[in-house]
């Protein structure tokens, strides 16, 4: 049986190393999934705001929505348009 144990030992060894490697890759992917997507989400929101601003330049109705988003309660005026 010590022969089978010695024969079995090398196989679990590399397998455990592979599992550790995969685990480290999973940890990296998890950390990437946790942190950069939040930054990406922030960038997405920023691009959404920029797109809304561009649409507000083209569409007066979206200007009204942008005003209510930005100045919710203080003033409802944006450039020459007041609500």
From Swiss-Prot:
Keywords: Cleavage on pair of basic residues, Disulfide bond, Hormone, Secreted
Gene Ontology annotations for the cellular component aspect, listed alphabetically: extracellular region
BP terms from Gene Ontology: blood vessel diameter maintenance; regulation of blood pressure
A Pfam short name: Urotensin_II
Annotated propeptide span(s): 49-71
Subcellular localization(s) per the UniProt record: Secreted
SS bond list: 77-82
Superkingdom of the organism of origin: Eukaryota
One GO MF term attached to the UniProt entry: hormone activity
The protein's role, per its UniProt record: Urotensin is found in the teleost caudal neurosecretory system. It has a suggested role in osmoregulation and as a corticotropin-releasing factor. The non-hormonal portion of this precursor may be a urotensin binding protein, urophysin.
Family: Belongs to the urotensin-2 family.
Protein name: Urotensin-2
Taxonomic source organism: Platichthys flesus (European flounder)
């Amino acid at each position: 049986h010590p022969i089978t144990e010695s024969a079995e030992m090398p196989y679990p060894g590399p397998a455990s190393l592979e599992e550790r490697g995969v685990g480290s890759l999973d940890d990296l992917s998890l950390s990437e999934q946790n942190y950069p997507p939040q930054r990406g989400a922030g960038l997405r929101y920023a691009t959404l705001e920029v797109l809304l601003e561009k649409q507000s330049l083209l569409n007066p109705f979206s200007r009204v929505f942008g005003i209510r988003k930005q100045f919710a309660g203080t003033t409802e005026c944006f450039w020459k348009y007041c609500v």
